[in-house]
UniProtKB/Swiss-Prot annotation:
Residues bound to pheophytin a: 126
Superkingdom of the organism of origin: Eukaryota
Membrane-traversing stretches: 29-46, 118-133, 142-156, 197-218, 274-288
Marked site positions, Stabilizes free radical intermediate: 190
Protein name in UniProt: Photosystem II protein D1
Coiled-coil features, chain-numbered ranges: none
Family: Belongs to the reaction center PufL/M/PsbA/D family.
Pfam families registered for this protein in UniProt: Photo_RC
N-acetylthreonine sites (modified residues): 2
Enzyme Commission code(s) on record: 1.10.3.9
Binding-site positions, [CaMn4O5] cluster: 170, 189, 332-333, 342, 344
Cofactor note: The D1/D2 heterodimer binds P680, chlorophylls that are the primary electron donor of PSII, and subsequent electron acceptors. It shares a non-heme iron and each subunit binds pheophytin, quinone, additional chlorophylls, carotenoids and lipids. D1 provides most of the ligands for the Mn4-Ca-O5 cluster of the oxygen-evolving complex (OEC). There is also a Cl(-1) ion associated with D1 and D2, which is required for oxygen evolution. The PSII complex binds additional chlorophylls, carotenoids and specific lipids.
UniProt entry tagged with the keyword Iron-sulfur: no
Length: 353
């Protein structure tokens, strides 16, 4: 009997690192996208927490009137925010080493730019990591495609909109009330409620919520009972079981009789594709709408579009919205300008002396 012994070459450190990074046996999959995702998201999260607690006021409008956003400077969880980078910086890349001092960097809102850029890179890598793990497991790529909707929305409000408006100071503040302020000002300046892409986004979000609730309630109402009346119906399911856990025929029949026959899906796969696609496509359109309004391609303007035979204006709902827009525009950045541009009929008089 002859034994053949084969010497196994020791794998290099780099090879072992590559195998570990791409292994699907790890408790949490890392992947090559994860190599970039982990440090960028850790950086964004750490700076956000520190700045939300202790960042000094920021000169957001570039007029030497700083705005406080952190907890230690008088805010609470609702009013607090990471104040956007100053209008004095505009779209300039503003890392710490570009400022004369850390105090100057903080005064000009440097943390906002740092957080936003690291966050966008991190969530983009998270999307790539979803695709990478799906690829390694032999799955289809639709999880990453669905996640592209919130990535597109975040990119639109944090990057595309500031680029279109010419300054990171126009980006969305990182806080609860700051988000509401961004929405109000956006409506005042771009009439987003009258933009068709925003309407599609609203249909996507609310429609997705409705369809999700309908699907969940139908499934829960048509479970195949495997337990007694004294036990929870949930105890009748075992992870990985081959048999169906609910009766799709019963659910289909119920919904078909509740609405009409063809309103109900008879194919579970097409149903779940629809549940995923509806909100994703809606949010894609919203992100596209934000990106177009960033360059001032705004919502529809039907102001004073209805007149009587004498030429007098008959107010419509569009005129009410326009009046609200003007009021909101007057109120925001009230120290940065004396009069909103929409209300200025003539050029400002020259001042001599």
């Amino acid at each position: 009997m002859t034994a053949i012994l084969e010497r196994r070459e020791s794998e290099s450190l780099w090879g072992r690192f590559c195998n570990w990074i791409t292994s699907t046996e790890n408790r949490l999959y890392i992947g090559w996208f994860g190599v970039l995702m982990i440090p960028t998201l850790l950086t964004a999260t750490s700076v956000f927490i520190i700045a939300f607690i202790a960042a000094p006021p920021v000169d957001i409008d570039g007029i030497r009137e700083p705005v406080s956003g952190s907890l230690l400077y008088g805010n609470n969880i609702i009013s607090g925010a990471i104040i956007p980078t100053s209008a004095a910086i505009g779209l300039h890349f503003y890392p710490i080493w570009e400022a004369a001092s850390v105090d100057e960097w903080l005064y000009n809102g440097g943390p906002y730019e740092l957080i936003v850029l690291h966050f966008l890179l991190g969530v983009a890598c998270y999307m790539g990591r979803e695709w990478e793990l799906s690829f390694r497991l032999g799955m289809r790529p639709w999880i990453a495609v669905a996640y592209s909707a919130p990535v597109a929305a975040a990119t639109a409000v944090f990057l595309i909109y500031p680029i279109g408006q010419g300054s990171f100071s126009d980006g969305m503040p990182l806080g609860i009330s700051g988000t509401f302020n961004f929405m109000i000002v956006f409506q005042a300046e771009h009439n987003i409620l009258m933009h068709p892409f925003h309407m599609l986004g609203v249909a996507g979000v609310f429609g997705g919520s409705l369809f999700s609730a309908m699907h969940g309630s139908l499934v829960t109402s048509s479970l195949i009972r495997e337990t007694t009346e004294n036990e929870s119906a949930n105890e009748g399911y075992r992870f990985g079981q081959e048999e169906e856990t609910y009766n799709i025929v019963a659910a289909h029949g119920y919904f078909g009789r509740l609405i009409f026959q063809y309103a109900s899906f008879n194919n579970s796969r097409s149903l779940h594709f629809f549940l995923a696609a509806w909100p994703v496509v809606g949010i894609w359109f919203t992100a596209l709408g934000i990106s177009t309004m960033a360059f001032n391609l705004n919502g529809f303007n039907f102001n004073q579009s209805v007149v009587d035979s004498q030429g007098r204006v008959i107010n419509t709902w569009a005129d009410i919205i326009n009046r609200a827009n003007l009021g909101m525009e007057v109120m925001h950045e009230r120290n940065a300008h004396n009069f909103p541009l929409d209300l200025a009929a003539v050029e400002s008089p020259s001042i001599n002396g």
